[in-house]
């Protein structure tokens, strides 16, 4: 299941989610932690990748998932005990949900905005009779399927989608459905906003200052000779 933010009420969709123990948080998530967003845009989330069967390869390789314009996902208060809900992607403790999206004047946290952290991807399973099982994966932003977003994280978004499908389609013998793909696109290096700021300052200020000092030292040495 994939959803996208809308200002309209979606009662039927909400009832389906709540039947499986989850619901969406009002608004769009913004990050205050510069290690969890890119492009100087707090809505371009780099969520934490939680460790589970779906994310094992991605988390072990310290990959990034990029999810712009995501809504928060939270569990309902009294979901039935036959449901198992695992977190796939979560935001940082500094994240918050901007409630008044249509009239948003600032990206700063305001009164009425909802404190994080939030889930932005969950895996839900439920054991049924006759050894059958319901399996659902839910992500709260359709941008996960966007080619440009996928390229910005070197294909990690599509790998997550493939792993999610594999988890839901796995057979009793443990085999999975897998379609490998090769891309001719140039890989993109994804750097969190905090790291980007550091390297910008380093390249634009520290390196030139070092070269000036080094050049001055060489000039003084030659002058004395």
Give the role of each language-model region:
Residues 1-175:
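Acidic, S/T/G-rich, low-cysteine, solvent-exposed domains in lumenal/extracellular/periplasmic regions
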Residues 40-47, 177-188, 219-222:
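Noncatalytic linker/hinge segments flanking ATPase motor cores
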Residues 12, 205-206, 216:
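Long, positively charged, glycine-interspersed low-complexity recognition regions
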Residues 204-205, 211:
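Hydrophobic alpha-helical transmembrane segments of integral membrane proteins
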Residues 212-225:
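Juxtamembrane interface at the cytosolic side of transmembrane helices
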Residues 144, 151, 178-203:
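Short, aromatic-rich amphipathic segments at membrane interfaces
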